Amino acid sequence: MGTCATACPTEAIHYALPNPEDTQKFIERTLANYEQAGGLDPIVLICSSRHEIYNVMALKALPDNVIPIVVEELPSVGIDTWFAALVNGATQVLFAASRFMPQTIIRVLNSEVGIAQELLDQLGIAKETIDILYLESLREGAPTLCTESFDLALGDLQGNKRQRLFTALDALSASRIPVENIVELPANAPYGTVSCENKDCTLCMSCVAVCPTRALHTDGQSPSLKFVEQDCIQCGLCEKACPEKVLTLTPRMNWVKEERQKAVVIHEEKAAECIRCHKPFAPQSMIDMLQNKLRGHSHFSDEAAINRIAMCEDCRVIDMFESMAADPMSQLKY
């Protein structure tokens, strides 16, 4: 039904036909043609092709500046497309829904629209600018219609789902002053930051290994953990993978584009140097942790074995063979 495509923050799952970019281009060109024809204050009404009769009834009750965009399923159009419409001339985006739709669709639609409305509110824009229009409510009266123009026409937005969304959000925030630069979002929002309790982090890189978007990454040159906020989808995999439990997720929106896109170091250490060749090879905290945990183990009963942990991969092998050559009988102890 398309709900998974709307809920997916990375576009790993997306509607294939039409794909999101084609839908956005269609809406952008429809709005451009409407403006060229002299139309004012266009409102986009996203309708499902499964409910044609109800769509016609809704349009009869709405003013002429409401433009229907028919899709196979309402949830097949994601939050990036909604905001793309706003930065291409639309004054409002509505969904022609019914309370008799499957609860799965209603739940996902409410969740995603709720996040969009929170973002709008942070920019001082009326929450109703993106809203669900339940057709049954038309019997009670006309819905709240927004006619304030944002005076934007960005055209086709480039990149993946998140890049297109943030392009639209940055354009809106450039014309509006956000309430605050950093504002908390609901717990289900796929935008936010990750913080690290540095004193307990060993830089094992388990979080980097599981991060699906490379929001958490390392440069491979030094023992450091880097983070790009715009790429974080708040999936929680890093939090679950961390053996020391030092990572904390915070859903929020950082409206400062440069800060959000910048790779920041959330933890770094001086590299431990091999005690034989002095080559940097691992975080010092990890070496200390391994030595403390393995001290007393039967395979690390002597100081020589403990010291090998503080050696690089090459020197460790050399030291083992030197020890075996000096005292071959010691191997019989194991």
Language-model features, listed with the residues they occupy:
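Short acidic, S/G/P-rich loop/turn micro-motifs used as interaction or catalytic elements
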Residues: 49-58, 73-74, 99-107
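Cofactor-cradling patches in redox/metallo enzymes
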Residues: 81-131
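Non-heme iron-sulfur electron-transfer modules
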Residues: 1-6, 10-34, 179-183, 214-240, ...
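Ferredoxin-type iron-sulfur electron-transfer modules and their immediate structural context
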Residues: 41-53, 105-106, 118-219, 231, ...
